[in-house]
Regions:
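N-terminal secretory signal peptides that target proteins for export/translocation
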Residues: 1-9
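Electrostatic cytochrome c docking/interface patches
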Residues: 27-49
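Bacterial N-terminal signal peptides
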Residues: 12-23
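Gly/Gly-Pro-rich "capping" loops immediately C-terminal to redox-active cysteine motifs
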Residues: 40, 61-92
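The canonical Cys-X-X-Cys-His
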Residues: 46, 50-61, 113, 117
């Protein structure tokens, strides 16, 4: 094969090499749920606590409260919390909610409530419960 013929094959070889190299580079998945952050039983306890302490303001479906609380699922939740940490969400809920008695529920109840919110926003349950300790939650991301 002469030199001119070999040069003519360079674009094809470059394209083949680019395709092969590109397929070996891992690409982060889009819209994949975060690692499991809570247990299903915890979310069930959180649902009971939600009915008792949160439902009047945020509604039975987390987005239709009688007293105008913001939606706790869907786009609003993703915008407000979806790029942060579980610790930030837990910290806010445990310090500011419910408005008539902020911080008055037990740490475990607040963790259960956060688990319930996560379950309603597409985060999958796992085997371990969300710890009721903000320091233990620092590296738990809500990013997907």
């Amino acid at each position: 094969m002469d030199m001119i013929a070999r040069l003519g094959q360079l674009p094809r070889l470059a394209l083949t090499a680019a395709v092969l190299l590109g397929s070996a580079i891992p690409v982060p998945a889009q819209d994949q749920p975060a690692a499991s952050l809570y247990a299903a039983a915890q979310a069930e306890r959180g649902q009971a606590a939600y009915r008792q302490s949160c439902q009047d303001c945020h509604g039975s479906s987390l987005d239709n409260g009688e007293f105008g609380g913001p939606p706790l699922k869907g786009g609003y939740f993703r915008t407000r919390w979806g790029q942060g940490s579980v610790a930030a969400l837990y910290g806010y809920v445990s310090l500011a909610m419910p408005p008539d008695r902020p911080g008055q529920l037990s740490p475990q109840t607040y963790a259960d409530l956060v688990a319930f919110l996560l379950s309603n926003n597409g985060y999958p349950p796992g085997d371990k419960e969300l710890p009721p300790d903000q320091n233990a939650q620092q590296n738990m991301s809500l990013k997907r």
